[in-house]
């Protein structure tokens, strides 16, 4: 289950940063799935560079937890983005969407397949200020 949650972080976060402002961001993620006793909240912080903020496919995820997941369809709007993705090694597929501004964001992702898994994530994020060492 822990690996699946890490996979969701890798999958959900790359598509969130189309025009987000660089700096220190705080994210709260709630994961739900059938059979889970209650939602599994998680939080993390990320220092996003100006380069990462410009390109949603190069932001987010954890390089120490590689994955073969890839975005297959990506649609961008002025303050929203949606995507479809697939992860060949796990047999999982998913869809997601996000709305954002320079200092905040919200997203929803649904991933299923593999061992009949149906995971849903809701993410909220806010910019805290400049990156801190």
Language-model features: where?
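Central antiparallel beta-sheet cores of small beta-barrel/beta-sandwich binding domains
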Residues: 39-95
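Tryptophan-anchored aromatic micro-motifs
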Residues: 21-35
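A short, structured loop/turn motif at beta-sheet edges
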Residues: 18-21, 73-79, 97-104, 126-133
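Edge beta-strand at a domain terminus
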Residues: 113-133
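Bacterial N-terminal signal peptides
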Residues: 2-12
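Sec/Tat signal peptide C-region and signal peptidase I cleavage site
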Residues: 13-17
């Amino acid at each position: 289950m822990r690996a699946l949650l890490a996979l969701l972080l890798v999958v959900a976060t790359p598509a969130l940063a189309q025009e987000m402002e660089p700096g220190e961001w705080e994210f709260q993620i709630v994961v739900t799935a059938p059979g889970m006793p209650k939602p599994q909240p998680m939080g993390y912080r990320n220092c996003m560079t100006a380069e990462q903020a410009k390109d949603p496919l190069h932001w987010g995820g954890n390089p120490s937890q590689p994955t073969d997941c890839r975005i297959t369809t990506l649609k961008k709007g002025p303050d929203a983005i949606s995507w479809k993705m697939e992860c060949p090694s796990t047999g999982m597929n998913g869809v997601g969407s996000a709305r954002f501004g320079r200092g905040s964001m919200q997203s929803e992702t649904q991933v299923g397949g593999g061992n009949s898994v149906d995971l849903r994530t809701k993410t909220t994020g806010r910019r805290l200020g400049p990156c801190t060492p």
